[in-house]
Amino acid sequence: TDLVGQEAMVRTLRNAFEADRIAQAFVMTGIRGTGKTTTARIIAKGMNCIGADGSGGPTTEPCGTCEHCVAIMEGRHVDVLEMDAASRTGVDDIREIIESVQYRAASARYKIYIIDEVHMLSTNAFNALLKTLEEPPEHVKFIFATTEIRKVPVTVLSRCQRFDLRRIEPDVMIALLKKIAAAEQAEIAADALALITRAAEGSARDATSLLDQAISHGAGETSAEQVRAMLGLADRGRVMDLFEMIMRGDAASALSELGGQYADGANPLAVMRDLAEVTHWVSVVKITPDAGEDPTVSP
């Protein structure tokens, strides 16, 4: 339930769990804020869940109430170890893991190592890890997360089941933000949500963080204008005027308008990005007029 917009991965995991073919190592890749670490924790819960009655097996729908689920959720499970490779890149840190791998899990079904930003490990650290990945003990599982999959050696990747977490689709993101806003009892305009969705570029974490800022910025209903100001975007009406001048070939007026927007505090880079968005929107609407009604592609 914590995973938004990752149906293909959930389906693959469910099939693997049901067939009792759980990989020894997983690697999650995707842009920031798509749920890599969340997924890693859910998989860890699923592998060690014993169900509310204490007799359940591995599942893709962990109960969330058994001792293992609760301990993993609170980050205090003795058999589920999380390590941030960004701050512990050396071979000594990995050796520590390798030495502890031989010992069985203290209380859970599996001993699980979650290594975040795994691409930050040094070459020597990867080499040390490789031997364990080649011949892992039955009771050990590795879950790696990375935003830079190209920096992970092929020898490591070939021993992992890989999941590419997609950018979250705009309509899914808007539905998520509406749900959060309703839970917070916050009023926020639909076009304001569309602006936040575009700015987040498919990252749920960025979107929820921007939504928090927008709600605290707005008194009463948060409008698109308030969100635009918060994001440092140029005034949309003035961008449309500028676009019209460019289309007319009126260079003098366009440069004068751009200078005026700059004087009023608009970031020239943001203006150019907005112009590119308007150009894209006009092109899309010319080809598929119905797109004009879609809030996620509006100018």
Residues covered by each model-derived region:
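P-loop/Walker A NTP-binding region and its immediately flanking N-terminal helices
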Residues: 1-162, 172
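Extended, largely alpha-helical regulatory/partner-binding modules appended to the mid-to-C-terminal parts
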Residues: 9, 34, 67, 71-78, ...
